[in-house]
Amino acid sequence: MSAASAFAMNAPSFVNASSLKKASTSARSGVLSARFTCNSSSSSSSSATPPSLIRNEPVFAAPAPIITPNWTEDGNESYEEAIDALKKTLIEKGELEPVAATRIDQITAQAAAPDTKAPFDPVERIKSGFVKFKTEKFVTNPALYDELAKGQSPKFMVFACSDSRVCPSHVLDFQPGEAFVVRNVANMVPPFDKTKYSGVGAAVEYAVLHLKVQEIFVIGHSRCGGIKGLMTFPDEGPHSTDFIEDWVKVCLPAKSKVVAEHNGTHLDDQCVLCEKEAVNVSLGNLLTYPFVRDGLRNKTLALKGGHYDFVNGTFELWALDFGLSSPTSV
C-alpha cells in the first residue's frame, strides 16, 4: 500500500465535499503537505555497523507499521488544526469552496478506488515461466535437448553464490549441459573432509572423476551477504546462527589477510577485498582434493577464480599457478 493510500485510509470520514458544504465553519485553502513516518524497526543503519544476519530464534512476519501524518514545517499543525484552519478559510473566502470541494472529492475517490494490482501467485509464476522456456527454447532447439537426453559432458564446474542476483547461467550465458554448477552461501569450497561438507566433496568428485570437467571456476560477487557476515561475525565466542557462522568461516583465512593488510579501511572496501580473497582461499582448498591435484599435474584440469560486480556490470577472471610438482620417493 502506498503512503498516500495509507494516509487516505486513516483520514477521518468527514473529509468530503458534501460535509464541507453543510459545515458552519470552514478552513483556509492551500496545499497541505504531509510526510509520513513509519513507526517500525526498519530504519537504515550505518554501513560500518556489523549486521546481525540471522537470529537463532523463529522469525515471524512483522506487524503492519503504524503510519501517522505529521505536517511539515510549512505549518507544524496537527491534523485537526489543519482541518479547522481549512474551514475557517472557506468561511472567509466562500469563493474557494467549489475548488476545495472538487479537490476533496478527488482525494475521496482516490482513497475509495480498489487496488488493481493482482496479488503474487507463485504457482502461476512457475507455470508461466516453464511455458515461456518450453515455447522459446525447448521446442525451438530439439537437437540440443535430444543430445542432453543421452547424457551430459560439461566442460566447466562452477562454484557460485546462492544469491538470487548472480545466477551463473544467466550472467555467463551458459547453455544447458555446458556447466556443472554448485551454489552455496558465499560460493565457498571447504577443504577435503570425508565427515564434513560431504555435499561439496561429492560434487567435486563427480565433476572431476566422472564428468571429466576441464575447468573449475570459483566465482565471487559484489555485495555478498555471506562475505559481509564473515567480516563482521566475531571470530570467537557463542554463535548467533545455527549454520551460517560455521560455514562462512571456511574462508576465515581470507578475512584474516584482509584485516591484517587493510586495517582501518572502511568495512565496505574490506568486504570487496574479501570477496576476491575468499575465492583464492577456495581455490587453495580445492588442492586438498587428491583427484583435483592429479588433474592439475596431468594438465587435464585447470582452476580459475572470478568476481562478478553487478553494481558496475564488470567481471574479473584470473588463474592461479600453484607450481605443483610430481611426488618423489626416498
From Swiss-Prot:
SMART domains: Pro_CA. It holds the Pfam family Pro_CA. One of its GO terms (cellular component) is cytoplasm. Keywords: Cytoplasm, Lyase, Zinc. Residues 1-109 are annotated as: Chloroplast transit peptide-like. It is found in: Cytoplasm. CDD domains: beta_CA_cladeB. GO terms for biological process: carbon utilization. InterPro entries: Beta_CA_cladeB, Carbonic_anhydrase, Carbonic_anhydrase_CS, Carbonic_anhydrase_sf. It is an enzyme of class 4 (lyase). One of its GO terms (molecular function) is carbonate dehydratase activity. Its main location: cytoplasm. It comes from the Eukaryota. It catalyses: hydrogencarbonate + H(+) = CO2 + H2O. Its EC number is 4.2.1.1. Reversible hydration of carbon dioxide. Belongs to the beta-class carbonic anhydrase family. Possesses a transit-like peptide, but it is proposed that this peptide is not removed and that therefore the enzyme stays in the cytoplasm instead of going to the chloroplast. This is Carbonic anhydrase. It comes from Flaveria bidentis. The lineage of its organism: Eukaryota, Viridiplantae, Streptophyta, Embryophyta, Tracheophyta.
